[in-house]
Amino acid sequence: AILVSLIFFDLLTKYLIQDNLFLNQSIKINEYFDLVYVQNFGVSFGLFSGYVSHWILILIALIVVILIFYLFIKSDKQLEKLAYFFVIIGALSNIIDRLINSYVVDFILLHYENFYWPAFNLADIYITIGIIMLIMSFFIKSKTVK
């Protein structure tokens, strides 16, 4: 139920952005945060945009999800399992978005003065949470090994 809920929430926010903003339109929320409608044809942060077919990106993402799912099954650590779960949720949601649109909708834009972080979405946040948790589990594991 959590998996479906998080994917639904990500896809819903992407739909609402597409339905209410024009492409590249930005709405200032506060000094550091804007909502913006960006079509990401590449991978994270728009890398490889226009250089690789969306079908290739989908195939690569599916292979990565399968590998991470294997790690999820093999792991006996709760923190690792939760971390893999978040990465899988984020990846699946972006895969679904790419299947629907041929691109991924990004809409969260963080900035400070003249520095702008590339736009991202909730699925990217799920993936980032999972990666941070994996790093934490690595440090916890290495600390207990000593």
Placement of each model-derived feature along the sequence:
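Alpha-helical transmembrane bundles and membrane-interface segments of multipass inner-membrane proteins
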Residues: A1-K146
